[in-house]
Regions:
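Glycine-rich beta-alpha junction loops
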Residues: 74, 210-212, 257-261, 265-270, ...
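Short hydrophobic alpha-helical runs that function as membrane-insertion/retention elements
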Residues: 203-207, 261-263, 336, 418
């Protein structure tokens, strides 16, 4: 049995990952290696695309590599399945309903692995598919947001030794009671990295509909450029701040177990040379690279799926933050930015942001439970905000970065509602209507449209 955790609160066991090494290790593709491929929903979006994925995987297997593949559900399938669930039970799901939602949502990936295994067999490649519970991938019981506790890789290793490609469902696992669980949106990324960690894979390649990690979303800033490398710290911040390329927990896994990650496109020709393919996209690196330190800001992340609440006129007494946020945490709702104003006349205002999908639940909690309990005067709610962040490992050693950000936004007439900082990022909360203007202005201000330095 080999096990791992998605974060500090899950630390129970440690994956064996001796094969992972460091970024300066020899190229793992020069000799036979165990490689994990992950394909997103768009890459699996049609029979033709699935056949192309199979051809790409078969190419790697024929080159002598042991291959484990983790596909997502076909694009749109998870939404379709959850839409069916909503149609038969439109109410707010309780614990029992969340269990059934996981049972339903997990079927999307089950279809994908079966189709991909069939496509590989059609290519003359021995292949077998497994669901998360068949492996098994063991999780806790937090339905729709489960965390991986351990992976038993014995069955998978036996199939690899027999020359088979193993296709495993992403996004899902099984809890201690035998119930199917899902890891939350983007959970297939986490599944792939966890499998790579458990099996000591040489590298985990994440195939998406983009060809790497960009300085920001090219749909917002056409001049955004692809980065050849990005540090683990920067990628973790970018993912947690709204970048859709990788799911946050997958980056946490990669950092904890030193899994080499590369993000690349599944829409390049499947028959591209393996050595060329293995060097494409963006490598998430663990080296403290001097070249990286020269870039003060590496990227701009943004998230429009946020909502802000302000509890007005709260008694300024010890423990007030816990009284407000404790009830929110008990409802399994994650809080992002938190700001408490300076006290006036013994009262203060307390603001925080949550994911927009939790807006109604938090609104009801504040109205019916929190505000009456803590003695606040009232609360306000704003579901139309966004968060824009600058990220860069060079911010550790450069002064004046935040002031440049604030000046740039002021010159565009954009008001800042909230600010939060860490060693390598500064985030601001803005009115949603200013998001794209802010991202474009900051991208220019920090010179991110300039060519990436080489050497």
């Amino acid at each position: 049995m080999r096990g791992c955790a998605a974060g500090p609160r899950d630390a129970r066991r440690v994956f064996h990952s001796a094969a992972n090494g460091t970024d300066s290790a020899p190229n793992p593709f020069l000799t036979m290696a165990l490689i994990v491929h992950k394909y997103g929903g768009t890459s699996m979006g049609s029979p033709e695309r699935i056949r192309n994925v199979a051809k790409r995987v078969a190419k790697w297997a024929r080159a002598g590599h042991q291959m484990v593949v983790v596909p997502s559900a076909m694009s749109g399938e998870t939404n379709r399945l959850l839409g069916l669930a909503k149609a038969v039970n439109p109410g707010q799901p309780d614990a029992a309903a969340l269990r059934e939602l996981d049972m339903i949502a997990a079927t999307g990936e089950q279809v994908s692995v079966g189709l991909l295994a069939l496509a590989l067999q059609a290519e003359g490649m021995p292949a077998v598919s497994y669901t998360g519970w068949q492996v098994p991938v063991k999780t806790d019981s937090a339905f729709t947001k489960a965390r991986i506790e351990s992976i038993d890789d014995g069955r998978v290793r036996a199939d690899l030794a027999a020359g088979k490609v193993v296709v495993i469902t992403g996004f899902q696992g099984i809890d201690g009671d035998g119930s199917v669980t899902t890891l939350g949106r983007g959970g297939s990324d986490t599944s792939a990295v966890a499998v790579a960690a458990a099996m000591g894979a040489a590298e985990c390649l994440i195939y998406t509909d983009v060809d790497g990690v960009y300085t920001t979303d090219p749909r917002v800033v056409p001049e955004a450029r692809r980065m050849h490398t990005i540090s683990f710290e920067e990628m973790l911040e970018m993912a947690s701040l709204g970048s859709k390329v990788l799911q946050t927990r997958s980056v946490e896994f990669a950092g904890k177990y030193r899994v080499k990650l590369r993000v690349l496109s599944s829409f390049t020709p499947w028959d591209i040379n393996i050595d060329e393919e293995a060097q494409s996209g963006t490598l998430i690196t663990f080296e403290d690279d001097e070249k990286m330190e020269q870039a003060v800001v590496s990227g701009i992340a943004f998230n429009r799926d946020e909502a802000k609440f302000t509890v007005v006129g709260v008694p300024d007494t010890p423990g007030i933050a816990y009284k407000i946020l404790g009830a929110v945490a008990d409802a399994n709702i994650e809080v992002d930015v938190i700001v408490q104003n300076v006290s006036h006349d013994g009262r203060t205002d307390f603001s925080f942001t949550v994911h927009r999908q939790d807006f109604q639940r938090v609104n009801d909690l504040l109205k019916n439970r929190i505000v009456p309990t803590v003695g606040a005067l009232q609360f306000t709610a704003d579901p139309r905000i966004c968060k824009v962040s600058i990220v860069g490992i060079g911010m550790k050693s450069h002064a004046g970065v935040a002031s440049t950000m604030f000046r740039t936004l002021a010159e565009e007439g954009i008001n800042i509602q909230m600010i939060t900082t860490s060693e390598i990022k500064t985030s601001v909360v803005l009115d949603e209507k200013y998001m794209e203007l802010a991202v474009r202005a900051l991208h220019r201000a920090f010179g991110l449209d300039a060519p990436e330095a080489v050497g």
